[in-house]
Amino acid sequence: MPLDVALKKKYYDEVRPELIRRFGYQNIWEVPRLEKVVINQGLGEAKEDARILEKASKELALIAGQKPAITRAKKSISNFKLRKGMPIGLRVTLRGDRMWIFLEKLLSVALPRIRDFRGLNPNSFDGRGNYNLGLKEQLIFPEITYDMVDVPRGMDIAVVTTAKTDEEAKALLELLGFPFRK
């Protein structure tokens, strides 16, 4: 049963027709759309204490609405006291309705709660139509209360689109309501 997510409805009712008008697409499948959102949290300190990974995993599951996968070290690096296979982070890939729900929450609740927020950096596109942003703490999400947090942990959020160029991706995200700096 598909959920009625306001941001998804906005994409189909307003954003897609506007993108077709702006870029003159001939085929509906040419129109850029959101493919997935990947949330990554690097936890270098987890190699000493497994409880850190557990706590961070619970927090990320609350934020994303989906249990995160543990990322492990690909190689051993002696300077970092790191062995191959050690858990060093968490990752969640959101698609479909969960992706739309997360983005709606990010845009309407989380980003406005950031102190001194002046807008997202418009230069964080990767050249292939994907957007990356970093958050410094998890407290900006409504599911995380102040009492739950022992250490502020940041995360990287990658918004993957089917757009061919950064210009198309920026137009898509702007129309969806991403607050870019001017």
Swiss-Prot record:
HAMAP family: Ribosomal_uL5_B (MF_01333_B). GO terms for molecular function: rRNA binding; structural constituent of ribosome; tRNA binding. Belongs to the universal ribosomal protein uL5 family. Part of the 50S ribosomal subunit; part of the 5S rRNA/L5/L18/L25 subcomplex. Contacts the 5S rRNA and the P site tRNA. Forms a bridge to the 30S subunit in the 70S ribosome. One of its GO terms (cellular component) is ribosome. This is one of the proteins that bind and probably mediate the attachment of the 5S RNA into the large ribosomal subunit, where it forms part of the central protuberance. In the 70S ribosome it contacts protein S13 of the 30S subunit (bridge B1b), connecting the 2 subunits; this bridge is implicated in subunit movement. Contacts the P site tRNA; the 5S rRNA and some of its associated proteins might help stabilize positioning of ribosome-bound tRNAs. One of its GO terms (biological process) is translation. Keywords: Ribonucleoprotein, Ribosomal protein, RNA-binding, rRNA-binding, tRNA-binding. The keyword Coiled coil does not apply. Disulfide bonds: none annotated. Gene3D superfamilies: 3.30.1440.10. PROSITE patterns: RIBOSOMAL_L5. This is Large ribosomal subunit protein uL5. The keyword Ion transport does not apply. It holds the Pfam family Ribosomal_L5_C.
